[in-house]
Design a protein with these regions (language model features):
Chain A
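Hydrophobic core/packing positions within alpha-helical solenoid repeats
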Residues: 33, 37, 43-51, 91, ...
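Amphipathic alpha-helical scaffolding segments comprising HEAT/armadillo-like alpha-solenoid repeats
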Residues: 2-6, 12-15, 53-75, 96-108, ...
Length: 133, 457
């Protein structure tokens, strides 16, 4: 998937792509594929920019992912946690309390990779370095 | 039926080929698996479940764990008193079943891989359905033992000692050799101070590991299914459940491996995934997934190193979750899955070390200063090594306060975090974000990362 066709996708299709990229990202982290992580980050950023360009309400399509927990046989815990983590980071300015609660839950109970990342995100917020928009 | 089966010591005593041997520095299982650890001046046997796990790999599940532990303990006590020959006699009298067919196949594979002689020991039982390729894969686990295996070779194969001066016991730690494959392969090399210190069972993970391995041990001790009396095909398959699908994503060729010891370096830039890769990336349908489904592992070893480590980290996460919830059923299920996947055993040290609770900075620093190896742990530079910190004086990078011994999986997680762009770093990787920051800021950031990844209190 490339950034080029994101603009042609509906919000729901973007949401589906958001999950796919996040799941791939979890695998790239697990497998130590650093270059892939960078590529996926760029793809996710392009997707998020596409959503943002559609107005403040468009991002709400990601809100259900704050508690993403699909049928358990279909996904690994780290993959689901990465979806939650990415959604929470993107929604801090939209639904701050819910997003922060998701980050805190991941930091406390998430798989190690996502737990550490959620904890660091909260640290950046507390330090005032990260100002969600 | 021979001595090994009946329990009578072989008439050749310590001069017969065997799978257990000792040196002044410890007790070993062929080809070079330590069965003792040094604590101060004393040699201490590994915990019984671990002794059983190692020895049963070659001799099959009928190994009597308690008897084995008693013999190892007696031999270790002899070594503590400097009585090497007496320890050797104690070991020579140990009652072990013959090497199993699978054990023999594994020994042959290891022997070929390391280039060491396989002791001519008795073999009994019947072959399993395990494919030969499986033993070749399992033999890789022993690669790191090459130097030790070469030096212990004449002890496990006494016939090889005939080339040594008569009546002089060969001590591989006094006369180490360069490993095969090097220009001086097989030649004696100088002694070094980096003696092997197998101390898997030290540290705060002991309690958790003991509980976990106690369960794993019971599962490993289950006797394999024997053939029905009239069944024409006797060998039962080693692993029973239907093999789950491989993990969601197959590794690419030239796959990056998880970062290893002491690297803390940024990855090279290069090509990323194709659009197809992303399109074909993990999709629903993965067995072993999810939190309320049984935890399963592939029966066959996954094809990429990164995948093995990924499964190990998933197992570690599941164990931590189960321990946190005091979910003994879940823990047993995980142990069962681990017991049925031989290929994951190389990750057990990492999995257990990952259960360590957060420690104080002093503890982490002191552990790094102890020297020697700790299986499952790495030394981590709080301000990373590498060109990204090229402006930091080397005496700061190498200072004791900058070096912490942490569980290997946590080390890998942290290194991957440093190399991944993060939204909160304005899309930069933490390595890029830290450029230009003061040494103090970089150090504090490193401590924060250790805290958030559950390493530092």
């Amino acid at each position: 998937m490339t950034s080029r066709n994101y603009s042609e996708m509906s919000d729901e299709e973007l949401a589906k792509a958001f999950v796919e990229i996040s799941v791939s990202e979890a695998d790239a982290i697990g497998l130590g594929k650093v270059r892939t992580m960078r590529k996926l980050f760029d793809q996710l950023r392009a997707l998020k920019e596409t959503l943002r360009a559609r107005g403040p309400e468009a991002r709400r399509v990601l809100v259900p992912f704050l508690s993403y927990s699909p049928p358990s046989a279909s996904i690994f815990a780290d993959q689901a946690a990465q979806v939650r983590l990415n959604a929470a980071r993107e929604l801090l300015a939209v639904v701050p309390e819910q997003a922060r609660a998701a980050l805190e839950d991941l930091a406390a109970n998430g798989p190690s990779a996502q737990s550490g990342r959620a904890g660091m995100c909260l640290q950046f917020l507390e330090d005032g370095v990260f100002k969600p928009t | 039926m021979t001595a090994a089966l009946t329990g009578r010591a072989d008439a050749r005593g310590t001069m017969r080929p065997r799978t257990l041997a000792c040196t002044a520095d410890g007790i070993w299982l062929w080809p070079g698996t330590p069965l003792t650890e040094r604590r101060g001046a004393a040699l201490v046997p590994l915990p019984t479940p671990h002794l059983y796990q190692h020895v049963a790999t070659l001799h099959g599940p009928a190994v009597h764990a308690a008897a084995l532990a008693r013999v190892i303990e007696r031999a270790a006590a002899c070594l503590d008193r400097g009585r090497l020959e007496e320890a050797d006699r104690v070991l020579a009298a140990v009652l072990l079943p013959p090497v199993s067919f699978d054990g023999a196949a594994l020994m042959q594979a290891i022997g070929r891989r390391l280039g060491v002689s396989v002791p001519d020991v008795e073999i009994a039982g019947w072959p399993s359905a395990s494919p030969p390729a499986l033993f070749e894969q399992l033999a890789r686990v022993h690669d790191r033992k090459l130097a030790v295996a070469l030096t212990l070779e004449p002890i496990f194969n006494p016939d090889l000692q005939r080339i040594a001066p008569a009546n002089v016991p060969f001590d591989p730690l006094v006369h180490p050799r360069w490993p095969a494959g090097q220009p001086d392969g097989g030649q004696f090399r100088p002694r070094d101070g980096d003696a092997i210190v197998p101390v898997q069972w030290q540290g705060p993970a002991v309690r958790v590991a003991a509980r976990f391995l106690a369960r794993l041990w019971r599962l490993l001790r289950r006797l394999p299914k024997l053939p029905e009396p009239r069944e024409p095909e006797p060998p039962p398959p080693r692993s029973e459940p239907a093999p789950p699908e491989p993990p969601a994503r197959a590794p690419e060729s030239g796959e990056e491996k998880p970062p290893g010891v002491g690297h803390n370096r940024p990855p090279e830039d290069g090509a990323g995934p194709t659009p197809d890769e992303v399109e074909n990336s993990p999709v629903p349908g993965n067995p072993g997934a999810g939190h309320d489904q049984p935890f399963t592992l592939p029966v066959e070893r996954p094809t990429g190193e990164g995948e093995v480590a990924q499964w190990g980290q998933r197992a570690a996460d599941k164990i931590r979750e189960a321990l946190k919830n005091n979910d003994t059923k879940r823990l047993t299920e995980i142990a069962d899955a681990l017991a049925h996947a031989d290929w994951i055993k190389e990750q057990l040290d990492n999995i257990i070390a990952a259960q360590d609770p957060p420690r104080s900075l002093d503890e982490l620093i002191e552990a790094a200063q102890e020297g020697g190896r700790r299986f499952g742990y790495d030394n981590h530079h709080i301000i990373e090594q590498g060109p990204q910190n090229g402006d930091v004086p080397p005496n700061v990078i190498d200072a004791p306060y900058n070096l912490a011994r942490i569980p290997r999986y946590k080390h890998w997680q942290i290194n991957k975090y440093y190399g991944q762009p993060q939204s909160e770093c304005e899309g930069l990787t933490p390595r890029e974000y830290l450029k230009g920051k003061s040494v103090e800021q970089r150090y504090q950031f490193g401590l924060a990362v250790l805290r958030k990844f559950g390493v530092l209190k």
